């Protein structure tokens, strides 16, 4: 090869390298923006597969459909008739009220008698837990309910039913059965016990639970640690999982998914307990309270702010939230106060001005910084 041709190849290689050097920062910026933008994305498709429509509530604009749970338990699924509208969300108090009233009409239907052997069963009635099963029935005497979920190859899951009344013993039973494994045939045993501990009734049924909405694995790898302390009997809650934003996952001690929470977006960065309800972030700009039936009882829209990322209790019972003003270059620089009674959102501190001297010596994140996925942002 001649010297002249070698020089041509060297020049061409140099041009390519320069072009790549110029494109890499652009690619980093575009990739980082896409990465952070997913946190602000809100769900636009709430639709799901279900069976035939068996009835309709014209007053509450809700379709009653057959839940596709196999040949065992017969259950319903509630489908708001506006579910495909562009601005629809389950995290809307009006939508929740319509679903609640539909459930009340079913409970109070004088033509039907709901018993333990033939309960009112509704899969995910409030749209917040894809594998949560609502049960309602009455007993002749005040009793308590416990249940066991058996799936071949997995450890049995046993829990006490948390009745919506808050009572341990009652004649009217209304609760959400948690623990059904998605994508599996679940054999459920309900044990109905009297106040003296005697078993008054045992009910068996199967639930062929559909796959997860998210596609996330229902079985995690479990590694035995060195601690000798006993594990709690509750469920582990996973925070935001990239690639699966818009969901919250609850796993038992054996790494089996027992509940898949369906959110508007974002993820469960923090779950607070508010009486018998949980309070959590259901999108980057919304907080919600959810009761034990999966019903959303309160929603707070943060308006021009996005969470980033923690929430906690204030001294006077308000919620404090770390946030940022949408569209600003500065991020994670606002402290908000949210009044749980009024839903009023107040900005308490703008750290960019509160710590002005420190802010003046900082700069936006560069493509070569450790937090390169936030390139261009003033963190």
Task: List the predicted regions and their residue ranges.
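Membrane-interface motif at the C-terminal end of an N-terminal transmembrane signal
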Residues: 21-45
């Amino acid at each position: 090869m001649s010297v002249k041709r070698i020089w041509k190849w060297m020049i061409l290689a140099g041009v390519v390298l320069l072009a790549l050097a110029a494109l890499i920062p652009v690619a980093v910026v575009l990739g980082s923006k896409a990465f952070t933008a997913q946190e602000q994305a809100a769900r636009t498709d709430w639709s799901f597969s279900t069976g035939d429509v068996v009835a309709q509530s014209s007053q509450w604009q809700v379709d009653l459909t057959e839940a596709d749970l196999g040949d065992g338990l017969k259950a319903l699924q509630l489908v708001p008739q506006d579910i495909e509208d562009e601005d629809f969300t389950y995290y809307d108090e009006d939508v929740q009220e319509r679903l609640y009233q539909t459930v009340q009409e079913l409970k109070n239907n004088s033509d039907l008698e709901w018993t333990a052997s033939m309960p009112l069963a509704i899969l995910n009635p409030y749209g917040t837990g894809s594998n949560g099963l609502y049960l309602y029935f009455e007993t002749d005497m005040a009793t308590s309910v416990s249940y066991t979920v058996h799936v071949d190859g997995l450890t049995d899951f046993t829990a006490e039913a948390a009745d919506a009344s808050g009572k341990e013993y009652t004649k009217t039973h209304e609760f959400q059965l948690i623990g059904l494994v998605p994508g599996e045939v679940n054999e459920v045993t309900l044990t109905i016990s009297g106040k003296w501990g005697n078993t008054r009734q045992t009910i068996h049924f199967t639930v062929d639970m559909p796959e997860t909405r998210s596609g996330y694995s229902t079985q995690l790898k479990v590694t035995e640690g060195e601690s000798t302390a006993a594990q709690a009997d509750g469920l582990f809650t996973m925070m935001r999982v990239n690639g699966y934003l818009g969901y919250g996952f609850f796993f038992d001690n054996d790494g089996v998914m027992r509940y898949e929470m369906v959110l508007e977006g974002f993820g469960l960065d923090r779950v607070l307990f508010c009486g018998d309800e949980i309070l959590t972030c259901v999108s980057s700009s919304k907080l919600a309270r959810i009761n034990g039936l999966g019903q959303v009882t309160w929603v707070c829209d943060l308006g021009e702010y996005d969470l980033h990322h923690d929430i906690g209790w204030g001294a006077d019972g308000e919620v404090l939230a770390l946030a940022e003003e949408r569209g600003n270059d500065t991020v994670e620089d606002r402290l908000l106060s949210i009044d749980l009674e009024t839903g009023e959102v107040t900005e308490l501190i703008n750290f960019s001005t509160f710590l002005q001297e420190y802010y003046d010596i900082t700069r936006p994140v560069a493509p070569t910084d450790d937090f390169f996925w936030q390139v261009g942002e003033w963190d």
